Curated annotation (Swiss-Prot):
Official protein name in the record: Glutamate--tRNA ligase 2
Substrates-to-products reaction catalysed: tRNA(Glu) + L-glutamate + ATP = L-glutamyl-tRNA(Glu) + AMP + diphosphate
PROSITE patterns: AA_TRNA_LIGASE_I (PS00178)
Taxonomic path: Bacteria, Pseudomonadati, Campylobacterota, Epsilonproteobacteria, Campylobacterales
Motif ('HIGH' region): 6-16
Compartment annotation: Cytoplasm
């Protein structure tokens, strides 16, 4: 069982989407169920509407799920599991205040040591715990042995007990911490493989320790994906616009192109241009590079152009939403436009009212002739017929003709454009 477990706290990051795509591909390859779990236990950071937005984005990318969970609805199970650990003396109530802990952290810092919980409350007698009226958290006792796990990308990793420490699993308000909720849910939902960003590597031994302490002995496999760097080679921040999946979509980049690019990023793929369904046939998670991958927007735009060309004409017409059969014309313009947004602008320039500028007289002459001109199969015949009828020459012929047909004074060769614009010439002459 594979899962994607986002939090509804902001726009979906491309790193999160990459994890969703990889989990989905692996689930499909192994004919296993795929889980979508919304991790909403940090109520103060949740943003209204983001849960639905996550589902909408996944649907756009062709990612479906067989099971859907809301983490906060599992709260009773989190509390039951915490109580079990306390009753078995594997976890304990900690009454240390934030101020006390902060003072100990400062002391460790001055001594040049890494802070570790000193076990102040670990050996409190039961009667002392019962009689203490202070608020408390619950800590899981640190493991007694080295925690090891194998990662499909990073190989075997190990963590010593002192580096895991006795960590908090339940807060003072009786809600679970991220690691505890995540570990318990993965256990309850029978997740068998976790693919996520490498920023979670330090969480993995804690989650392994939680499940082991609860007596869960089913093996879990992992793949921690390297971080995505920006074009300057620095870790991509959520504040950077193109780190947001929503921004990429609103900019007119197709979901299929984003998927293609994210699968390629830091990976060895047999082809440069492919679909999600094609990738499912050959994708290998172990081939993903250990090294961070640099995001290249220009490369993504190049891939997007190729995916626009691959779209069926009726589907592209629907996306362009301009009430005309413009698919072939739009595909021709991918030599200049890289996104759906740019293509719409090109199409609007062609079919909207034009500014003729200094060529107003010439444009009027040509428009009258174009209203019922014979539409020859090849451009040379069309051009010669129009030249003869208009008596215009050189710049005073070609520039106004370009404005009428494209709405711009610059653009593709008219001879190249003609086969795609031919059927619209009579209409354009009447605008």
């Amino acid at each position: 069982m594979y899962r994607f477990a986002p939090s509804p706290t902001g726009d979906m990051h491309i790193g999160n989407l990459r994890a969703a795509i990889f989990n989905y591909i692996c689930a499909r390859q192994k004919n296993m169920d795929f889980i979508l779990r919304i991790e909403d236990t940090d109520k103060s950071r949740n943003i209204k509407g983001k849960e639905e937005e996550i589902k909408e984005i996944l649907n756009l990318f062709g990612i479906s799920w067989q099971h859907y969970y809301i983490q906060s609805e599992n709260l009773k199970f989190h509390r039951q599991m915490a109580l079990k650990l306390v009753s078995e003396k594997k976890a304990f109530a900690c009454f240390c205040t934030e101020e006390e802990l902060e003072a100990k952290k400062e002391l460790a810092k001055k001594q040049g040591k890494a802070y570790r919980y000193d076990g102040t409350c670990e050996k409190l007698a039961d009667i002392d715990v019962l009689e203490c009226e202070k608020s408390f958290v619950i800590r899981l006792k640190k493991p007694t042995h080295t925690m090891k796990f194998t990662d499909f990308i990073k190989g075997e990793l190990s963590f010593e007990p002192e580096n895991i420490d006795s960590f908090v699993i339940m807060r003072t308000d009786k809600t679970p911490t991220y690691n505890f909720a995540c570990a318990v849910d993965d256990m309850l939902e029978n997740v068998t493989c976790i693919i996520r960003g490498e920023d979670h590597v330090s969480n993995t031994p804690k989650q392994e320790h939680i499940r082991a302490s609860l007596g869960y002995d089913k093996a879990m496999t992992y793949a921690h994906l390297p971080i995505i760097l920006n074009e300057e080679g620095v870790k991509m921040s959520k504040r950077e616009a193109h780190s947001s999946v929503k921004w990429l979509l609103e900019s007119g980049i197709l979901p299929s192109a984003i998927t293609n690019y994210l699968i390629m990023l830091g990976n060895k793929t047999p082809y440069e241009i492919f679909t999600l369904e094609e990738a499912i046939k050959w994708f290998d998670i172990s081939k993903v590079s250990k090294a961070p991958a640099r995001f290249d927007l220009k490369k993504l735009l190049q891939i997007n152009r190729e995916h626009i060309k691959m779209i069926k004409d009726d589907e592209l017409n629907k996306i362009l939403d301009l009430n005309k059969d413009l698919a072939q014309l739009a595909k021709f313009y991918t030599q200049e436009a890289s996104t759906i947004k740019e293509l719409k602008e090109k199409m609007r320039a062609i079919f909207n009212t034009k500014d003729f500028g200094e060529f107003e007289t010439e444009c009027k002459i040509l428009k009258e002739l174009l209203k019922d001109i014979e539409l020859f199969e090849n451009y040379e015949d069309f051009k010669n017929k129009l030249l003869n009828k208009s008596s215009l020459k050189g710049k005073k012929f070609f520039m106004p003709l370009r404005i009428i047909l494209t709405g711009n004074i610059h653009g593709p060769e008219l001879s190249d454009l003609y086969p795609y614009i031919k059927n619209f010439i009579h209409e354009l002459a009447r605008i």
